[in-house]
Amino acid sequence: MREYELMVILNPEVEERAVEPTLKKFLEVVTKENGTVDKLDIWGRRRLAYEIQKKSEGIYAVVNFTAEPQTAKELDRVLSLNEAVMRTKIIRPEEQKIHGK
C-alpha cells in the first residue's frame, strides 16, 4: 500500500452541500479495494488561474488516501469520466518518496 494525495477541482455549479457526498461516492473505489481515506479537506470555491471548460472558478478538495497503485489509477479513471470533475491530480507526497528510497 502506498500513500497518495489527490487534488480535485469540481464544477462550481455543484452545490456546496453536495460536494462531500459526491467525493465520498468517488472514494468508495479506494475503500472497496481495502484502501483507506486518511483525510478529506474541502477548500471550497476558489478562482482558477486560467479558465477550464469556460469556467473561472472551481471547488477545490484535497484527499489523502492509502491504496495500491492500480486502485489509484482506477480512481483517476472514474473521476475523469464524471462531468462534475474539471481537473484531477494524484501524486505521492514528497515525504513518502524520500522515505521510500
Swiss-Prot record:
Keywords on record: Ribonucleoprotein, Ribosomal protein, RNA-binding, rRNA-binding
A matching Pfam family: Ribosomal_S6
Single GO cellular component term: ribonucleoprotein complex
Source domain of life: Bacteria
Extent of the signal sequence: none
A GO BP annotation: translation
InterPro entries given in the database record: Ribosomal_bS6, Ribosomal_bS6_sf, Ribosomal_S6_plastid/chlpt, Transl_elong_EF1B/ribsomal_bS6
Annotated S-S bridges: none
GO molecular function, one term: structural constituent of ribosome
Family designation: Belongs to the bacterial ribosomal protein bS6 family.
PANTHER family from the UniProt entry: MITOCHONDRIAL 28S RIBOSOMAL PROTEIN S6 (PTHR21011), SMALL RIBOSOMAL SUBUNIT PROTEIN BS6M (PTHR21011:SF1)
Name the UniProt record assigns to this protein: Small ribosomal subunit protein bS6
UniProt source species: Kocuria rhizophila (strain ATCC 9341 / DSM 348 / NBRC 103217 / DC2201)
